[in-house]
């Protein structure tokens, strides 16, 4: 799991093995805005781990679809497509697919695979930070 607090820049990188006893490593109170891209995945993770759901969720996928609904999107409406649409840097599709396949394969993961997956997650988090001003007035 990788989380960045937007205003301080503080970064939290932690490996969560999926045990229900793992406490949620981030605050989720009413004063917190939880930003994700296609937030359903993150929210399902919270439920699977027995964590509370965040009170305030901003899904940049929804915001991107609101801005682009009805437009031709040659790179799609996923995170990579949104980054490309706004001219932002994005990892290669093949690299993203390789990491997704590794995550879907499931564990056990080697130490190297854990680092690769955490780096991949951080890349998505960093991309959200770059994308946020294009989709909101925050």
Regions from the PLM with identified roles:
Residues 1-5:
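Short beta-strand scaffold segments in enzyme catalytic cores
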Residues 7-23, 31-136:
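Active-site-proximal helix-loop-helix substrate-binding element of RNase H-like nuclease domains
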